[in-house]
């Protein structure tokens, strides 16, 4: 289960739900619109639209 996508070395993945990076990669979650940040940043299980923007692993609200 993808949590905050942080590897032991502090790497964090830009696409959390998909494990978008591997440990040792330099990558980080960016604040962006909800639908662009993986399953963890979607509205329910469909994620068609959200209020505002959120980071990877954040929950967002349905419009």
Swiss-Prot record:
Keywords annotated in UniProt: Copper, Metal-binding, Metal-thiolate cluster, Repeat
Keyword check for Metal-binding: yes
Mapped Sequence repeat ranges: 23-30, 56-63
Superkingdom, taxonomy of origin: Eukaryota
Induction or repression: Both MT-I and MT-II genes are regulated by copper ion in a concentration-dependent fashion, and both are inducible by silver but not by cadmium salts.
MF annotations from Gene Ontology: copper ion binding
Biological process terms in GO annotation: cellular response to copper ion; cellular response to silver ion
Other notes: MT-I might bind approximately 11-12 mol eq of Cu(+).
Physiological role: The metallothioneins are involved in the cellular sequestration of toxic metal ions.
The family this protein is said to belong to: Belongs to the metallothionein superfamily. Type 9 family.
Protein name in the entry: Metallothionein-1
Recorded name of the encoding gene: MT-I
């Amino acid at each position: 289960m993808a949590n905050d996508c942080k590897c032991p070395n502090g790497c964090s993945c830009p696409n959390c739900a998909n494990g978008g990076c591997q440990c040792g990669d330099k990558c980080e979650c960016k604040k962006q619109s909800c639908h662009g940040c993986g399953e963890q940043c979607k509205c329910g299980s469909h994620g068609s639209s959200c209020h505002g923007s959120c980071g990877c692993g954040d929950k967002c609200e349905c419009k």
